[in-house]
Amino acid sequence: MKSPILDSFSFMGGMLLKEIIPKNSVVESYFLYSGEIEIDLCSKERLVISHTSKYPTYEFWWMAKNQPRRIASMAESIFPGLSIEMLYRFQENWHKQRDPVYRAALFYILNRCSKENQVSSGALDRRRLSPITTSRFKKLSINNFHVILDKSQDLYTRINNNIKSDIRLFPVGDFGLNMLDAGSEGSYEQEYINHQQLYDTLSAEKFNWVVLYKYHKKVIQRYKDYNIIMVDKYGNQTTQQDNCEDIIVTNF
């Protein structure tokens, strides 16, 4: 089962990740956005509980899990009448629309049309959203997937204020140096991630955790005391940084 939402992460190490996380594991995932990694895990006999502090993202995924046909049908109905100019305007105010089904449909449409796979940003191309994709969305079935809205944005509070799980998963994506001390709150749909705070928080915890990054030499340096698996563009493990696309870090 594939996620209806695209992610700029484009994580290649799915097979390796499933070797690390055993079947029947309870996995708590943080920084939910596209659900690509989480849905892949839950469709392979793992229970995934995904956390986000962004209400629009929580709302979309709650509805996508419980009413996928309703959202997809709404998107199918409104998309033909949305000009490219209207879509650009909706990038700025989609989250202010009153109808939650309409908001969820816009979340889906804008993400699929954005060349950056974002909802609130990116150059738009209507041709990126195909009827086949929307038809598949109607059939989305993710029974082993649950989404939780975290009231706190403090990472330490969030990871110490939830159920007991076997593994905590942190799909981060890009390591943005300019985000370290910028104080940015991210976008309406994606969380701001302070990389230093994440490292400091995980270093102090005893539970099993997995962190996923796109390749950056700073990630290798920062997590040098932990288990690092480098993944090439084919999804295979590599020992060569020149061939590395993604990084999997574990403390177990």
Describe the role of every protein-language-model region:
Residues 47-52:
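Conserved SAM-binding motif I beta-strand of class I
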